[in-house]
Amino acid sequence: MSLSMRDPVIPGTSMAYHPFLPHRAPDFAMSAVLGHQPPFFPALTLPPNGAAALSLPGALAKPIMDQLVGAAETGIPFSSLGPQAHLRPLKTMEPEEDVEDDPKVHLEAKELWDQFHKRGTEMVITKSGRRMFPPFKVRCSGLDKKAKYILLMDIIAADDCRYKFHNSRWMVAGKADPEMPKRMYIHPDSPATGEQWMSKVVTFHKLKLTNNISDKHGFTLAFPSDHATWQGNYSFGTQTILNSMHKYQPRFHIVRANDILKLPYSTFRTYLFPETEFIAVTAYQNDKITQLKIDNNPFAKGFRDTGNGRREKRKQLTLQSMRVFEERHKKETSDESSSEQAAFNCFAQASSPAVSIVGTSNLKDLCPSEAESDAEAESKEEHGPEACDAAKISTTTAEEPGRDKGSPATRAQLFPAEPSRARDTARLDKASPDSRHSPATISSSTRVPGADERRSPGREGPVATKVDEARAIPAKDAFAPLSVQTDATAHLAQGPLPGLGFAPGLAGQQFFNGHPLFLHPGQFAMGGAFSSMAAGMGPLLATVSGASTGVSGLESTAMASAAAAQGLSGASAATLPFHLQQHVLASQGLAMSPFGSLFPYPYTYMAAAAAASTAAASSSVHRHPFLNLNSMRPRLRYSPYSIPVPVPDSSSLLATALPSMASAAGPLDGKAAALAASPASVAVDSGSELNSRSSTLSSGSVSLSPKLCSEKEAATSELQSIQRLVSGLEAKPDRSCSGSP
């Protein structure tokens, strides 16, 4: 039997020089007497007064222990043995052979610990204390069911180094700082029987890690200098004091004792689990560890996609605004379907998470990530184009510096382009699978004959800066074809616009070949038309001049911002309520025909052409996922009229899948009526032309259903009223031009 002794034992060789005096018991400590065998006491034990009251004919074994216990119970003053005697409660001196145990400890959640250990486990320490994750949990076995045990854990330094996280890995950064005060954590259920400990998982989840040296949680016990594990004073509490950027190793201890105060005199069984090693940090360094903790910690829900963290709140706000946008659109379309027989479908049913809804009146781009805030979107507008996941957009403006040198710097060329320069060719190509363009990308370019820009009337503020930026772009190409490149229907269905589809026969067709675009730059200065572009690519505001035959025009379903109703242009607007006619101002009052609820090319294709005169490179128009503008044509003339388009009989018609579209007048009445009920989608022939100057309405007006054909006269009168409403817009550019420096 071997017991831990505090006082040093005098070797037997030195004892020969000290005569034994039975009446001078204080010469020997009680621990020395009890710890040694009979070389000195063959048949005598030490009574308190030196007399041989307790005798044992043999070695000092269990009988003498029993006698000592009996003596203690009868009140023998052991203090008389001398001041050096360090007496422990005698019941703890019972031989351990009576209790048979072989404790075994198994670490819980070992797989999770292994995952953290592979990446380099980090534990955050704070001044107030932070719990560990994964929590330290073990399962014990092999304990004596009747004996009582105290279970503890402490955290020790794994080495004498200080670490730093550099180049995605931990490396030694120097020698360790001075060690913090020792602190052990006693399981709050201690002491308990072995049966109780083995019936449950022993968890130390309440242990907290802190870097606060002045932490006062706990109490202190003095361990004897000859203790097998520790010497000196140890504090016990709920918080362990650690140094940041140091590596630590948790330890688990089992002590068979029925009183915590007996810990310094008890035998500790210590267990180490290398996978629980960690580095203490004040903030997580490795993103992989952060994500692993978020994924596995049930208390980290605030950082998850489904939680209420800061990032998730931005996502939820985006999704909420998308829902509001869709609900508003559904309401508007349902209101219009009563009079138009559901002729107009939304271009953008914003169902892709990459589409960010911006509910403000400012012109904003699609955010690259759904969690991007509005402020970030605005900042990106100021710092140039950013690559969106949905598309890659770039805009350049080719100018002729020699043109119009005598004109004022802010004057724009808004007159009809010459026929040789008024040709904008649009080509609908089937992009190769390895194309650099994303599923639906429009690359377009036009020639810019003049370098001067004009500020749009009434909205000079947000446009003026963009005009200056556009003027700073050097000229590159004198002429570049304006082409529309799109992927096949299957690719488009997987892109940001799941509903966008093209008829197979449209591949390689030419669109609006050589037509000047009748647009007013004012509508690009954050009017109602463009406000929702970032919000799902819905507001399709740009229009080409409509056709009185009602077939080759395009529908302008420009969804305005919060307060604006869905507006339709051209003769179709004549059938709408007056509040919808007001919105026609943003879409120029030009007739647009729906194309199978969507368009073979985005409206913003034409929007960007007009936007070049005022928005140019820095405008968020050019970063729309459907735009890739190489140069722009500022020679655009605003016209509130529907422009007749003579379409050859041999040409295919830009038709729609609407079953109720018919034509009121024109050379193709019969063919248009026949195509009205056909879902087939065909393309406008490249030979069709738009007359750039048309001061009068043609004999027929566009109508979208046979029911509306009889309302030509009403439509004509309504269009005339619209003409009067917008007639002042042509005069405003002159006034703004004269007032500008």
Swiss-Prot record:
Alphabetized CDD domains for the sequence: T-box_TBX2_3-like (cd20188)
UniProt tissue specificity: In adults, highest levels in lung. Also found in brain, heart, kidney, liver and ovary.
DNA-binding residue intervals: 107-220, 241-305
Biased composition (Basic and acidic residues): 377-386, 420-437
Keywords: Developmental protein, DNA-binding, Nucleus, Phosphoprotein, Repressor, Transcription, Transcription regulation
GO biological process, one term: embryonic digit morphogenesis
Compartments (UniProt record): Nucleus
Role summary: Transcriptional repressor involved in developmental processes. Binds to the palindromic T site 5'-TTCACACCTAGGTGTGAA-3' DNA sequence, or a half-site, which are present in the regulatory region of several genes. Probably plays a role in limb pattern formation. Required for mammary placode induction, and maintenance of the mammary buds during development. Involved in branching morphogenesis in both developing lungs and adult mammary glands, via negative modulation of target genes; acting redundantly with TBX2.
Self-association state and partner proteins as the record states: Interacts with PML.
Entry protein name: T-box transcription factor TBX3
Native species: Mus musculus (Mouse)
